[in-house]
UniProtKB/Swiss-Prot annotation:
One of its GO terms (biological process) is Mo-molybdopterin cofactor biosynthetic process. It is found in: Cytoplasm. It is an enzyme of class 2 (transferase). InterPro entries: MoaE_sf (IPR036563), MOCS2B_euk (IPR028888), Mopterin_biosynth_MoaE (IPR003448). This is Molybdopterin synthase catalytic subunit. Pathway: Cofactor biosynthesis; molybdopterin biosynthesis. It catalyses: 2 [molybdopterin-synthase sulfur-carrier protein]-C-terminal-Gly-aminoethanethioate + cyclic pyranopterin phosphate + H2O = molybdopterin + 2 [molybdopterin-synthase sulfur-carrier protein]-C-terminal Gly-Gly + 2 H(+). It comes from the Eukaryota.
Length: 198
């Protein structure tokens, strides 16, 4: 059985509830000594506001591809047997499950770590959007994990651009002109010398 055949990824259409037992049964296996799960449910309050329900929308083809990629990364990082990920779309009333992740592994540490990684990455990068519906209004929510991921990616991009500029100047020899670029909290000139320019 290939790694992809050991993943069950479902984006559930409006009106379909998450069947927790189905996904736990899917990941169960004689060689698995642990099954780690995460179940996200709708809570009744947020920052002092009474929540009636959450409503989810998704770009399903891309969400499925993203989840598959996240599962592949988890498999390459931890010793996992099977993974199940299910996410509801449409309204999810208070107390009901909107997302479920189940991971089976030989040992609990791999399953627990992979489960945490999967939910964190789902919230940070999968195109599923949430609207919170309150007694006195509603608002589309942007996950804090998503914002943190965007910031992290921007910082990495800036670091790569800076490094590329420095490497390009070094490669060219830069005709003796002095261009200072910050690099790892040190100031170096374009030739890599630690001389200060005067």
């Amino acid at each position: 059985m290939s790694a992809e055949e050991k993943n069950l990824i479902e984006i559930l259409e409006e009106g379909h509830k998450v069947d927790v037992v189905k996904y736990i049964d899917y990941v169960s296996a004689p060689q698995a000594g642990a099954i780690a799960t995460f179940s996200g449910t709708t809570r009744d309050m947020f920052e002092g506001k009474t929540v009636l329900e959450l409503r989810y929308e998704a770009y399903v083809p891309m969400a499925t591809r993203c989840l598959s990629s996240i599962c592949t990364t988890a498999r390459s990082t931890w010793d996992i047997h099977k993974i199940a990920v299910a996410h509801r779309l449409g309204p999810v009333p208070v107390g009901e499950t909107s997302v479920l992740i189940a991971v089976s592994s030989v040992h609990r540490a791999d399953g627990l770590d992979a489960c945490k990684f999967l939910i964190d990455e789902l919230k940070a990068s999968v195109p599923i959007w949430k609207k919170e519906v309150y007694t006195n209004g509603e608002i589309w929510k942007e996950n804090s994990e998503f914002m943190e991921k965007r910031l992290e990616l921007a910082e990495k991009r800036d670091s790569i651009v800076k490094k590329t500029v420095v490497e390009e100047h070094r490669r060219r020899g830069c005709c003796g002109s002095k261009v200072r670029v910050e690099e790892d909290e040190e100031h170096k000139d374009i030739t890599g010398d630690n001389k200060s320019s005067s």
